[in-house]
UniProtKB/Swiss-Prot annotation:
The organism of origin for this protein: Chlorobaculum parvum (strain DSM 263 / NCIMB 8327)
Gene3D superfamilies xref list: 1.10.286.20, DNA helicase RuvA subunit, C-terminal domain, Elongation factor Ts, dimerisation domain
Stated role: Associates with the EF-Tu.GDP complex and induces the exchange of GDP to GTP. It remains bound to the aminoacyl-tRNA.EF-Tu.GTP complex up to the GTP hydrolysis stage on the ribosome.
Protein's UniProt name: Elongation factor Ts
One Pfam match: EF_TS
GO CC entries: cytoplasm
UniProt gene name: tsf
Length: 288
């Protein structure tokens, strides 16, 4: 067995976050091979290397900012490595600054924002360079993961940020009565955040995704011993249930388990003599 040095043990600990004794044992078990030691620890469920990679993508904040007239809104995800930094004033202040900059400059994508110059407080650097400077300031890598902008010229925007700023949703609703529709739009934003739909309506769900689900359900039915002549009917039943899970208008309404979102919209329109149509939504969850 090769001699295991304290330096090697420390290097493995720095890489994985695992305790010194476990690192020493891993190196002994793998003949001092660093890579094999990491794999050994992962297999034992003790390694933190994979978790650290996830933390880079999952810690940070979702930030949403809307114009005063609620016609334009931006949602972005800014990542860091630890929750400690994510909750700090330096990080949250920077995230809010980026959202304000994106809204003011009509940025519709991450790339748009990266090319914009920040103010004097951040050295008049472009956002892309400021991210690197901020990394040095907070001691962790910062990354602008994604950004989207929604507009509702003929309606209203609403948003929802879950406590902790790890989950947020922005929704655009077309309506001829925007003031009356604001509360409903807020509920719909909460619906998007909580229920995680992928599209507004059934027709927008990608055909290839539907076909993939159908094939999975078909194979499941056959594996359950269902007769071939009944399989198609079973598949369609399960596809309809799938739509109820991923299509916003077909989901169960979070504030009334006996109602569908489509029914809530219909009731609102009748009661308020209004036209309401969900135009688009964006949902960001840290690391997702």
């Amino acid at each position: 067995m090769s001699q295991i040095s304290a330096k090697d043990v420390k290097e493995l600990r720095d890489t994985t976050g695992v305790g010194m004794m476990e690192c020493k044992k891993a190196l002994e078990e793998t003949g001092g091979d660093m890579q094999k030691a990491v794999e050994y620890l992962r297999k034992k469920g003790a390694a933190m290397a994979a978790k650290r990679a996830d933390r880079e993508a999952s810690e940070g904040a979702v930030c949403i900012l809307m114009s005063d007239d609620q016609k334009t809104g931006v949602i972005l995800e800014l990542n860091c490595e630890t929750d400690f930094v994510a909750r700090g004033e330096v990080f949250t202040g920077f995230a809010n600054e980026l959202a304000e900059l994106a809204l003011a400059n009509n940025c519709e994508s991450r790339e748009d924002l990266l090319a914009i110059n920040l103010g004097e407080a951040y050295g008049n650097e472009k956002v892309e360079d400021a991210l690197k400077s901020m990394t040095g300031k907070v001691g962790e890598k910062l990354e602008l993961k994604r950004l989207a902008m929604l507009k509702a010229e003929d309606g209203v925007l609403e948003s929802y940020i879950h406590p902790g700023s790890q989950l947020g949703a922005l929704i655009a609703v077309e309506t001829d009565k925007p003031e009356e529709t604001k509360a409903l739009a807020k509920d719909l934003a909460m619906q998007v955040a909580a229920a995680s739909p992928i599209e507004v309506g059934r027709d927008a769900v990608p055909a290839e995704l539907v076909e993939k689900e159908k094939e999975i359900y078909r194979q499941q039915a056959l594996a359950e011993g269902k007769k071939e002549e009944f399989v198609d009917k079973i598949v369609m039943g399960r596809i309809n249930k799938y739509y109820q899970e991923v299509v916003l208008t077909e989901q169960t309404f979070i504030k009334d388990q006996n109602a569908r979102v489509s029914g809530v919209l219909d009731d609102f329109m009748k009661k308020n003599q209004a036209q309401v149509k969900i135009k688009a939504f964006v949902r960001y969850q840290l690391g997702a």
